Structure formats: structure tokens, C-alpha cells
Regions:
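Alpha/beta-hydrolase superfamily serine-hydrolase fold, recognizing
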Residues: 1-159
Length: 159
């Protein structure tokens, strides 16, 4: 379980990102912090869809649900190193207010000093998985290299 990677796509990326936070994430489940977080076209903020989800899915619940949290709001200085990517032509992220998605996550990671790699592709729409035949093709290899790099750095003795 040491230095494991947590991978999430789209809304699964949002759940993975929230799991990496202190408030409702891995500490509550008594598991180690992920060694790295790998995200493909993550939804950071469900934005205007939150009331719709509440109305359609959780009509009788007053408790907070996963969609009430933003990944960027869960980022603290001890958040795992994060690799994430998304496309400029991702119409789903545009529908959820584009600047509240990848750009907001990047700002939160930078503000908290969390190591990260962000790739923004011109032609990489939502739901393309490993992205064969798009500008994002090869992202999974890049993400694995980021994971290896972060794991190697974490295992070096402190100076």
C-alpha cells in the first residue's frame, strides 16, 4: 500500500481527489495517503449541477455528498503529488464553468506547494480514456513516469 497511485477519470477523478483530502478522505478510512493522484479530465467542481444531483439522486438526504466537495477545496500542503490533464475542447468541463475545473485545481496545488504536472491539450474531448488518436495520446505513460519520479523522490532520505 505504500506509494500507491489513485487514478480517476471525470467524476471518478473528483471522487479520487476528494479521497486524497484530510476532511473526508483517506484518514477517515484508516488507510495510508496515496503516493500520487493521477487524474484524466477531472471534474473539480460540479458547479450548477449540485442542486440537480441533490434533487434527482439524494432527494431525502440532508448530509453532504461527494458532489458537494471540490477537489481544489480539499488540497492542503500534504495533498499527494498530482498529475492531471484535460482538453480545451472538453464541452462537459465547459458546461461546468471551465475555470472552476482544471485551472482552479492548478491554482490550489500551486498555492499549497503540492508537486503537480498539468497537461492541457488542444484536441482531447471528455470521455476518451487512454486517448488514442488524440492530442492526449500517451498521457498514461507520462502519468506513470510522474508516479515513478515522485515515488523515487519520496524515498530519498531527508537532507
Amino acid at each position: 500500500t505504500e506509494d500507491y497511485a489513485l487514478l480517476g477519470y471525470s467524476s471518478g477523478g473528483q471522487i479520487a481527489g476528494v479521497f486524497c483530502g484530510q476532511e473526508v478522505g483517506y484518514p477517515r478510512y484508516n488507510v495510508p495517503r496515496p503516493g500520487v493522484l493521477l487524474l484524466a479530465y477531472p471534474i473539480n467542481n460540479f458547479y450548477e449541477a449540485k442542486p440537480i444531483y441533490r434533487w434527482l439522486i439524494d432527494t431525502y438526504s440532508e448530509d453532504l455528498r461527494y458532489y458537494d466537495y471540490n477537489i481544489s477545496g480539499c488540497v492542503t500542503p500534504d495533498f499527494p503529488p498530482t498529475y492531471f490533464w484535460y482538453g480545451l475542447n472538453d464541452i462537459l468541463l465547459m458546461a461546468f464553468n471551465y475555470y472552476e475545473q482544471g485551472p482552479a485545481l492548478q491554482k490550489a496545488l500551486a498555492r499549497n506547494g503540492v508537486p503537480y504536472h498539468e497537461s492541457v491539450y488542444k484536441r482531447a474531448f471528455h470521455g476518451i480514456g487512454i486517448a488514442g488518436g488524440t492530442d492526449a495520446e500517451g498521457w498514461l505513460n507520462d502519468a506513470a513516469a510522474f508516479w515513478e519520479e515522485q515515488t523515487a523522490q519520496a524515498q530519498q532520505p531527508a537532507a
